[in-house]
Amino acid sequence: MAGYVQHGQTTTLEHAAAVAYLSLALVRKLGIRCNERALVRGALLHDYYLYDWHDHNAAPDAWHGFTHPRHALRNAEADFPDLTPLERDIIAHHMFPLVPSPPRHVEALVVSLVDKACSTIEVFAQRPWVRTPEGGAAC
């Protein structure tokens, strides 16, 4: 995941880590009761599709925005056979409404919303999740 660019200059690994961190921070800040372990695992694996979606020769199809949750879920199931149904829901439905089936659990809804916020930040900010030498976030 570290070898693939997600949005702007952000790698897929940086993006997934940001979504996991901010999803957990959000549920704790708002006092949302949920399965935090599944929330973090699902967030870390939500874009586990393992290809460069910018390279049309590497991508399995031309509809990345619509199909990558399916590829991510397939890869996650192969590499992490202990995935729970909740973690599968997070991965499979994080692109709602592009994926027409809505999230079934609050954890999946949180990851879906935080993913969109992180993606927007990553498109418009250069390296937003990279720490500066002073120790602060770049944005």
Predicted regions and their residues:
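Metal-dependent phosphohydrolase cores
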Residues: 1-139
